[in-house]
């Protein structure tokens, strides 16, 4: 999978491709924050050669002004849920799996980013409180937060119980609370 971005009239656009399970090349393009459109190509046109496909994609979209998104412009978003114990319970594990899957789909299909992982454990401020943290990397902080809220609400994943915090991707300091 390869993803490129470009700014056009103060709007951020994305273009990405991947190879489907059916051996089709899927090219997905759109304005960041929207689902965009897909185009299917037959992978056999590329002689099963990933480099040839990557060159085709890069050539096509770089001519239109698309480039890699610099990591200095990325954001970490952490979605936090309270847990009742350090080990968590069945609900916590279910919530972790469902929220991670749905958020990864939501962020990916809208060109916003992806889920990078999760952790479950004690809070930094109070060792007697426990949380599930889901870490997301996004290209636009505000659109990412809005997409996360909308997704968790739509799929009824304890939306009213979350906190969302943010920090620049390249910054190694504290997160700043954005929503609770």
Go through each PLM region and give its residues.
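A short, exposed loop/beta-hairpin motif centered on an aromatic-Gly-Thr core
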Residues: 34-48, 132-138
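Short, intrinsically disordered low-complexity segments
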Residues: 107-146
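Short, hydrophobic/aromatic-rich segments at coil-to-beta transitions
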Residues: 1-6
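Conserved short beta-strand edge segments in small beta-sheet-based binding/regulatory domains
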Residues: 154-171
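Surface-exposed beta-loop interaction hotspot
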Residues: 56-98
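Short, low-order "capping/linker" segments at domain edges
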Residues: 170-180
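A short, charged, amphipathic alpha-helix used as a generic interaction element across diverse proteins
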Residues: 44-62, 145-153
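Surface-exposed, low-hydrophobicity interaction/linker segments
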Residues: 85-119
